[in-house]
């Protein structure tokens, strides 16, 4: 651990694990600490104190979080734990983190910014009060970001009103709480003004935005605006247009209200991309999961979306081997996948999540069978994806550049509208043919698709 001197500000190390929602919590914590005069450290050894924002949803995430806490304690010694794992109980009913790592300075659950700040202040007094606008260039409202400068996550709500039997998120993060629409749009405007070229809208359930407020009318720039996803997306599209920026929607449940968003995608006002967590297709499995929609309605809805916007890309996640899943129910899922032609897929073999109702459902399947079904599912999904990628060869696409070595003369890596960062594929860019052409991170380029490389595309910048 570094010894702090009077000549420099105290330094905070931050590790953010888990989903983009947790990442935005980490950004909020760091924004406030930076406003108070704390500096950040990229290493445990260079920090005076380390904050670990944990994930506690599935067993692998719990292990990663606990291992990271142990590593931070070993290399630094002063550790504050926050996030979903901080709200989990151990075998004896006590706090899991406290049981396994009793030397941590403090433990909080998710969305506990003030508690984390209080713990930091107790253990590493703040150098000054936050009387300044934090980031130049219009970014003060948006705060610090842990993503690359050209894209950012915009969290529109917290918590979830669903009680899916495989999930403990409502226990960890509570019921749905939507952000005021004016606050969301102010942050979006600041992000665009600060150079963000892609805004990724996230929450636990984006389709339900405003339900807890009964869609009441808010105000933004002196104009009335209903707190509802349609109005929010319309306003985000209008904000993005002058900057030529993208708006990408995540965690959108297939409610009837989502149908109104598809014409906006067809008109080019937001990206024709939807992240829709379907989880399964068979009505009986969805009933056991307590999911809010049926597989038949989902298939019909996706088909209607494609009629309105043929270019739409659908990403989804699925669970196979759920308790009681029969062979016929699994085959139903494979048939659904083929019929729906899902573009991007994530699939998990069901695993116990401590505290989830599904753990006590009858018909728990052997893990080898769950893994076998996942492998079969992914084989079908990858064949569908490969065929769709092959059809893009010869097309010209807009690509947002994420990496450009050699001053932009050696090619690079970017993404098309069909690719969300970290979870989807990429577009590998060849070196520009024109001497005058260079690639720059955070800027767009037109590229001609010349080949397919696994889940990715190969393209020649134009």
From Swiss-Prot:
Positions bound to [4Fe-4S] cluster 1: 19, 55, 84
Q: Where in the cell is it found?
A: Cytoplasm
| GO biological process, alphabetically ordered | tRNA modification
Domain TRAM residues, every copy: 390-462
Q: What class of enzyme is it?
A: transferase
Annotated membrane-spanning segments are none
Question: Catalyzes what?
Answer: L-aspartate(89)-[ribosomal protein uS12]-hydrogen + (sulfur carrier)-SH + AH2 + 2 S-adenosyl-L-methionine = 3-methylsulfanyl-L-aspartate(89)-[ribosomal protein uS12]-hydrogen + (sulfur carrier)-H + 5'-deoxyadenosine + L-methionine + A + S-adenosyl-L-homocysteine + 2 H(+)
Radical SAM core domain: from which residue to which, for each copy?
Answer: 146-388
Q: Which NCBIfam families match?
A: 30S ribosomal protein S12 methylthiotransferase RimO, MiaB/RimO family radical SAM methylthiotransferase
Family label: Belongs to the methylthiotransferase family. RimO subfamily.
The cross-references to PANTHER family, in alphabetical order and at most eight, read: RIBOSOMAL PROTEIN S12 METHYLTHIOTRANSFERASE RIMO (PTHR43837), RIBOSOMAL PROTEIN US12 METHYLTHIOTRANSFERASE RIMO (PTHR43837:SF1)
Protein role: Catalyzes the methylthiolation of an aspartic acid residue of ribosomal protein uS12.
User: What name does UniProt use for this protein?
Assistant: Ribosomal protein uS12 methylthiotransferase RimO
Q: Which gene name does the record give?
A: rimO
């Amino acid at each position: 651990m570094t010894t702090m001197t009077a000549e420099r500000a105290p330094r905070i190390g931050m590790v953010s694990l888990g989903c983009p929602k947790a990442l935005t919590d980490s950004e909020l914590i760091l924004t406030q600490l930076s406003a108070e005069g704390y500096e950040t450290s990229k290493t445990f050894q260079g920090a005076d104190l380390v904050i670990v924002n944990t994930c506690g949803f599935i067993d692998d995430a719990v292990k990663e979080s606990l291992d990271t806490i142990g590593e931070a304690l070993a290399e630094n010694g002063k550790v504050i734990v926050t996030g979903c794992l901080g709200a989990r109980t151990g075998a004896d009913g006590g706090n899991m983190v406290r049981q396994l790592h009793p030397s941590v300075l403090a433990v909080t659950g998710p969305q506990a910014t003030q508690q984390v700040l209080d713990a930091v202040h107790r253990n590493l007094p703040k150098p000054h009060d936050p009387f300044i606008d934090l980031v130049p260039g219009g970014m003060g409202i948006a705060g610090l970001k842990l993503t690359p400068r050209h894209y950012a996550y915009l969290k529109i709500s917290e918590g979830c009103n669903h009680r899916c039997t495989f999930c403990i998120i409502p226990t960890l993060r509570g019921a749905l709480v939507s952000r005021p629409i004016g606050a969301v749009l102010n942050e979006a405007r600041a992000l665009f003004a600060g150079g963000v070229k892609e805004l990724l809208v996230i929450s636990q359930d984006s389709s339900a935005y405003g339900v807890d407020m009964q869609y009441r009318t808010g105000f933004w720039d002196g104009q009335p605006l209903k707190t509802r996803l349609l109005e929010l997306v319309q306003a985000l599209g209008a904000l993005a247009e002058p900057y030529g920026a993208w708006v990408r929607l995540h965690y959108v449940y297939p409610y009837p209200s989502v149908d109104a968003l598809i014409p906006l995608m067809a008109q080019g006002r937001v990206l024709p991309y939807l992240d829709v967590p379907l989880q399964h297709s068979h009505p009986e499995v969805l009933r056991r999961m307590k999911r809010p929609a049926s597989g038949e309605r989902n298939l019909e809805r996706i088909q209607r979306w494609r009629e309105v916007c043929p270019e739409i890309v659908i990403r989804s996640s699925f669970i196979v081997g759920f308790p009681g899943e029969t062979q016929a129910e699994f085959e139903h899922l494979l048939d659904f996948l083929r019929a729906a032609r899902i573009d991007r897929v994530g699939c998990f073999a069901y695993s116990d999540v401590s505290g989830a109702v599904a753990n006590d459902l009858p018909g728990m399947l052997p893990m080898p069978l769950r893994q076998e079904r996942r492998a079969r599912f992914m084989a079908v999904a990858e064949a569908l994806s490969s065929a769709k990628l092959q059809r893009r060869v010869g097309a010209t696409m807009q690509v947002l550049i994420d990496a450009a070595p050699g001053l932009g003369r050696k090619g690079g890596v970017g993404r098309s509208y069909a690719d969300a960062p970290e979870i989807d594929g990429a577009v590998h860019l060849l070196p520009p043919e024109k001497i005058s052409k260079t690639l720059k991170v955070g800027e767009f380029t037109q590229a001609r698709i010349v080949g397919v490389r696994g889940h990715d595309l190969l393209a020649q910048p134009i």
